[in-house]
């Protein structure tokens, strides 16, 4: 009897967080959401056994895939219907410079993939660094992560991931997916999300490192009031000057308020 970790002759590798999508209905729904068009600059992260690659590539002349697993990268290079269309980059997406895919005459990046759940959060942070060169991103993620991405102030799911992602992108949940759509089946529900980078952001952080610090320090102690969690860099009186109540908890602050505090901090560091 074949192991449930084996799909199309490939054994899923736990260290790569591999769960292969095989449900045709779900695949069709994702491809429809991506809506690939000839001439666009499409990039897939972790194509695996090409469940999404094949239907997307059928509508494209060329596309790029970034695959860490050398066995899967080799399969893609020899794939009978894909090898002429694909540029296969054997690399770790967490360290890859996606800006190198913006060659002469190429449009903004459209990135998609069934992301390994064990690296999805840091990978999204990495991809946000390229937001000014990205048209949109479509990812299959753990449902809980999609809820965190889309969460607003006042909810338990709202945190650093929500604020930092929403600073760069509009977050649009697209589709919920059960474990049975994958082989091997994960122990959690999944969901597809669309991330659309803001073209003309109305909220601008002077130093993104300051915004990251404010989010990290705030949500690292989310039961504390911001008067206490931010006490090592801003006083209660200074928060009041910004029009922010020091009795609030971090989860009650809006994106605009986080950026306001971060910009105040950036100004202090420049002074």
From Swiss-Prot:
Record keywords: Cytoplasm, Methyltransferase, RNA-binding, rRNA processing, S-adenosyl-L-methionine, Transferase
Key word rRNA processing present: yes
Pfam families: RrnaAD
Enzyme class: transferase
SUPFAM superfamilies per UniProt: S-adenosyl-L-methionine-dependent methyltransferases (SSF53335)
GO molecular function, one term: 16S rRNA (adenine(1518)-N(6)/adenine(1519)-N(6))-dimethyltransferase activity
Keyword RNA-binding part of the UniProt annotation: yes
Primary localization: cytoplasm
Subcellular location: Cytoplasm
Catalytic activity: adenosine(1518)/adenosine(1519) in 16S rRNA + 4 S-adenosyl-L-methionine = N(6)-dimethyladenosine(1518)/N(6)-dimethyladenosine(1519) in 16S rRNA + 4 S-adenosyl-L-homocysteine + 4 H(+)
Superkingdom: Bacteria
Binding site residues for S-adenosyl-L-methionine: 19, 21, 46, 67, 92, 114
Listed GO CC annotations: cytosol
E.C. numbers: 2.1.1.182
SMART domains on file: rADc (SM00650)
Signal sequence interval, chain numbering: none
HAMAP family in alphabetical order: 16SrRNA_methyltr_A (MF_00607)
Family: Belongs to the class I-like SAM-binding methyltransferase superfamily. rRNA adenine N(6)-methyltransferase family. RsmA subfamily.
Function: Specifically dimethylates two adjacent adenosines (A1518 and A1519) in the loop of a conserved hairpin near the 3'-end of 16S rRNA in the 30S particle. May play a critical role in biogenesis of 30S subunits.
This protein's name: Ribosomal RNA small subunit methyltransferase A
Gene name tied to this protein: rsmA
């Amino acid at each position: 009897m074949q192991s449930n970790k084996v799909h199309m002759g490939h054994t899923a590798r736990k260290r790569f967080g591999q769960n292969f999508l095989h449900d045709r209905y779900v695949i069709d729904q994702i491809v429809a959401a991506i809506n690939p068009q000839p001439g666009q600059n499409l990039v897939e992260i972790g194509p695996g056994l090409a469940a999404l690659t094949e239907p997307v590539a059928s509508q494209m002349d060329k596309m790029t895939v970034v695959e860490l697993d050398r066995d899967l990268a080799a399969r893609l290079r020899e794939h009978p219907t894909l090898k002429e269309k694909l540029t296969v980059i054997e690399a770790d997406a967490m360290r890859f410079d996606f800006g190198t895919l913006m060659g002469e005459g190429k449009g903004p990046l459209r990135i998609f993939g069934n992301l390994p759940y064990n690296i999805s959060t840091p990978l999204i942070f990495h991809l946000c660094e390229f937001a000014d060169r990205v048209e949109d991103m479509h990812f299959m993620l753990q449902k809980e992560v999609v809820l965190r991405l889309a969460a607003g102030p006042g909810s338990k799911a709202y945190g650093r991931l929500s604020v930092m992602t929403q600073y760069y992108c509009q977050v649009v949940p697209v589709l919920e997916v059960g474990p049975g759509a994958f082989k091997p089946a994960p122990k959690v529900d999944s969901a597809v999300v669309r991330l659309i980078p803001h073209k003309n952001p109305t909220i601008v952080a002077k130093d993104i490192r300051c915004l990251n610090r404010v989010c990290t320090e705030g949500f690292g102690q989310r039961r504390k009031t911001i008067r206490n969690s931010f006490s090592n860099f801003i006083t209660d009186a200074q928060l009041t000057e910004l029009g922010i109540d020091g009795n609030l908890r971090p989860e009650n602050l809006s994106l605009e308020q986080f950026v306001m505090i971060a910009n105040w901090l950036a100004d202090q560091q420049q002074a």
